[in-house]
A protein has these predicted regions:
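Histidine-centered divalent-metal-coordination microenvironment in nucleic-acid enzymes
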Residues: 22
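Non-catalytic alpha-helical scaffolds and adjoining flexible linkers that form interface surfaces
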Residues: 1-18, 26-251
Length: 251
């Protein structure tokens, strides 16, 4: 790159020198770009800057917001930290993902609005689903690992690299103790899939979504996604998740 204009969002920053910082900048055209620039780039703001450099670490100059910044507050702020951590830790450098970038931009817009607890969890599940798809880990909810339709009264074990494995068949071939959190009843998977089939096109409009999904279904969906996130992070703790849980205890 040679003084190339980039627009996007700051995902993360680290101290670099007295007046400079190392930035992880998420762009629509180049994915996550690593660069060094003057300290002070704000999170969650739509930003334009100029990037130069042939190596993986660029030099960022002329950093400026493109639109007035509307603050993200409360629980929504911690959700924003979580989205950022997923992206800067999981995405490869300079690998464009324009669909995921648009999803992230819309998610930030929604996080600037008042959301109840159910709407906030739904926003996160939709975003995680888009991320899994981009990373090649899309979760198939209507068939098991052998391509057979999910059965309502059947138990399945979720394995990130395989999908849903028939629990009874797996136990017969290789009896093993599994964590209860990895076992899912088919009817819950069907309910999640039915919800997605109905509401996928309305992902950016969460109004009345909280009335369209049962609390138990959302809880199961959240547990399923947590298994995938833990797998992708090799079971290392997420800083944003710990921060969110910590502040929740002191509210």
């Amino acid at each position: 790159m040679r003084n190339e204009p980039l627009t996007g969002y700051l995902l993360h920053h680290k101290p670099y020198k007295e007046s400079r910082a190392l930035y992880y900048f998420f762009t629509q055209t180049h994915g996550v770009v690593h660069g060094v620039g003057k300290k002070g780039m704000p999170l969650f703001a739509h930003i334009q800057l100029f990037a130069s450099g042939k190596r993986s670490l660029k030099t960022f100059t002329q950093i400026q917001p493109l639109t007035p910044q509307v603050a993200i507050t409360g629980q929504n702020l911690y959700a924003g930290f979580y989205l950022n951590e997923l992206l800067w830790k999981l995405l490869a450098s300079e690998d464009a993902m324009p669909v995921l970038w648009q999803n992230y931009q819309h998610s930030l817009t929604t996080l600037r609005e008042p959301l109840n607890g159910v709407q906030l969890r739904l926003l996160l599940r939709f975003f995680e689903q888009a991320l899994f798809t981009e990373l090649g880990y899309a979760i198939t909810l209507d068939t098991d690992s052998q391509g057979e339709p999910i059965k309502q009264e059947q138990d399945y074990r979720f394995i990130a690299d395989e999908g849903f494995v028939n629990y009874i068949a797996a136990q017969k071939s290789e009896p093993t103790e599994f964590a209860a959190s990895s076992i899912f009843l088919g009817k819950w998977l069907q309910q999640i899939d039915d919800y997605l089939q109905t509401h996928q096109e309305q992902v950016y409009s969460l109004k009345n979504h909280d009335k369209a999904i049962q609390a138990d279904t959302l809880k199961v969906w959240s547990g399923l996604h947590k298994l995938m996130i833990d797998h992708l992070f090799d079971y290392q703790p997420l800083q944003s998740r710990a921060l969110w849980q910590q502040q929740a205890r002191y509210r």
